[in-house]
Amino acid sequence: MQVQEQVIAFLSANSKALRFLFLFGLIFGVCYFLIGLAPGVRLGIVQPLTAFLASAVTAIINLFGARAWTEGTIVRSSSYSINIAMGCDGIEASSLFLACVLAFPTSWRAKLTGLGIGIPLIQVINLARLVALYYAGVYLPSVVEGLHVYVAQTIVILLSTGLFIFWLERFATEYRRA
């Protein structure tokens, strides 16, 4: 009986944190399923967003004289080409942020503020990452794979986490749920 009492005491003492973790896992799981596995969402939302990102990357690097063009999700130039594939579109980082914000116990006003500012900002961060990876491919081709897999993805996740912490301190605590 002592173990059962300890489990009950643990669950009671940590009910808010456990609720957050459960909701976070559920929301992120649903997002990941819809993004990764549901073909309608993938074809109707994710692919057009990824093609838009490719066009935006092309427009930005052309501002610096790259003479690049877009073919679907591929950014091509005479110097280098990148394919913005699943996982490179910023949707996973946005989904993590969305799940954190929606799972946190605060007002809907604070949640909508966080999502309205946070998700577009994460996409801008990801866009900067893609532009930087293009130029890394042009000027540092021997290290671009390591930059892509380890450094750039880590930076996007860390900045997304920092954005969540900023939202917690600035907005979520200001509009607490009654």
Question: What does each of the following model-derived ranges do?
Answer:
Residues 1-178:
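Hydrophobic N-terminal alpha-helices or hydrophobic patches in metabolic proteins across all domains
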